A protein has these predicted regions:
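Zymogen propeptides
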Residues: 1-273
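Short catalytic-site patches enriched in acidic/histidine residues
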Residues: 263, 269-276, 309, 316-319
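Short nucleic-acid-contacting surface segments enriched for D/E, G, S/T with interspersed K/R
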Residues: 284-292
Length: 444
């Protein structure tokens, strides 16, 4: 079904880079899957915030209030005067906490009793966590139950690998409609769009004849259906998303979409979510349900959108061709992943690249990265820059390829075992910590 080999490269400064290379025969056996939510995933995310995020990025972090909701908590749809009709319970609670909790002298102040009671109810059930940086601001961070551990799912699978970017840090949460653990980027399987494209980043595609390419696919090129209603940009609506737009026009109506769900409906003039988009119409839309379907890529066998391209037509990509948020440009509305390293040639990290060889057969590469704690130069991999990864991919015979989510998420499991090391580590023991992810690719 596939072959796997490990190669070790030595950089000029004597640091090493280990790379796992998988080669497969065809694309028909590769499928997307979403690991089941694990209770440990929320606790691990909270630990990552407390032990790493607020320490490394302390001066751009305030007090982070992370929360998730128990399955038995029932909340009605809420017609909020500022945010509109909220259909997602996470949005309802996020709006409540944003409106009715203040931070004073690093202490939470509740404006009303109902908010305080809900907060303590969630806290008593282990659904609340606080992680504080240096800034005197409160960030309300709802956590979606849409992520889990690759190693705990489909344990008899031949191969599993992580795939998509997902919202993970406080700067990714730009509005009440956003939540952590939201998948970002196009996923297509046998003509079905599992997750919509965002931010017009590059997409690795395989058509039904097995030909691969790196191309751009925009939301504006797709049909969007809610119930029996079809929406198409420029025909009966405008499709608005970051970074082109921060707010919708004041006239008309907005359907707020994240992934495959309408999360809210409101009048125009509001913020656009950082992890979704807005269908803006002049006519009051009907909303028979909140499920969203996408069409227009039925000729695709497989497609995935995440990071920058690595190789196009056999030539390594030597610069950013896809856009990423730059913290040094605060006038541009942030969009995830907001803390993506932007030094193309020098920022080293764990990487995952998916692509095809010159015969359009699948290749997947894992570039092992330095451990967050206890890294030993020359004994462990230091990670690859985007430029270094692209050059190695081309050297190994890749024709077309793009980066998937890297960093602490990067991992390949063959027969449910890893041949390289994870970069997330325990700060005391330096043991590997598997990071929960929103989706993966699997070969049974």
């Amino acid at each position: 079904m596939f072959t796997s080999e490990i190669k070790t490269y030595t950089y000029t400064n004597k640091e090493i880079q280990r790379v796992q290379i998988l080669r497969m025969e065809d694309w028909h056996h590769i499928s997307f899957f979403q690991p089941a939510y694990a209770e440990d995933a929320f606790r691990q995310l909270c630990d990552l915030y407390s032990n790493y995020m607020v320490k490394k990025y302390a001066y751009v972090q305030g007090t982070n209030l992370l929360f998730t909701l128990p399955d038995d908590l029932r909340l009605p749809w809420t017609n909020h005067p500022r945010y509109g009709v909220l259909y997602d319970p996470l949005c309802v609670v996020s709006a409540m906490f944003r409106d009715h909790i203040l931070l004073r002298n690093k202490q939470l102040i509740f404006k009303n009793k109902s908010t305080e009671e809900l907060y303590h109810q969630l806290q008593d059930r282990g659904c609340i966590h606080l992680a504080s940086g240096k800034l005197p601001i409160l960030s309300v961070l709802p956590v979606r139950k849409s992520f889990g551990f690759l190693s705990q799912e489909n344990k008899d699978a031949s191969m599993k690998v992580n795939v998509s970017f997902f919202t993970m840090n406080s700067l990714d949460i730009g509005t009440v409609y956003d939540s952590l653990a939201t998948s970002i980027g196009l996923c297509v399987q046998r003509g079905e769009i599992l997750n919509p494209p965002l931010f017009d980043r590059e997409v690795f595609t395989v058509d039904k004849q097995g030909k691969t390419a790196v191309r751009r696919i925009s939301l504006k090129d797709l049909d969007i259906r809610i119930g029996n209603k079809r929406y198409r940009d420029g025909e009966n609506c405008r499709i608005l998303y970051r970074p082109e737009h921060s707010y919708t026009p004041r006239h008309g109506y907005d359907l707020i979409v994240v992934g495959r769900q309408v999360t809210a409906f409101r009048r125009g003039g509001g913020l656009i979510p950082s992890s979704g988009f807005v269908i803006h119409t002049d006519i009051l839309p009907e909303l028979p349900d909140t499920q969203v379907r996408y069409g227009g890529l039925e000729d695709m066998l497989f497609a995935v959108q995440a990071g920058n391209s690595a190789v196009i037509n056999g030539i390594p990509t030597n610069r950013f061709l896809s856009s990423f948020h730059d913290l040094k440009k605060p006038w541009i509305p942030p969009y995830p992943p907001t803390l993506y390293p932007l030094d193309y040639a020098r920022d080293r990290a764990p990487r995952i690249v998916i692509g095809a060889d010159m015969q359009d057969q699948p290749m997947i590469l894992w570039f092992e990265g330095a451990g967050k704690y206890g890294y030993q130069p020359g004994k462990e991999s230091c990670g690859a820059s985007l430029k270094e990864a692209a050059e190695i991919c081309a050297e190994l015979g890749m024709k077309n390829g793009v980066h998937l989510d890297g960093g602490g998420s990067a991992q390949i499991l063959c027969a449910n075992k890893r041949e390289l090391l994870l970069s997330d580590r325990d700060p005391v023991t330096y043991e590997e910590n598997e990071r929960a992810v929103v989706n993966g690719l699997i070969v049974q």
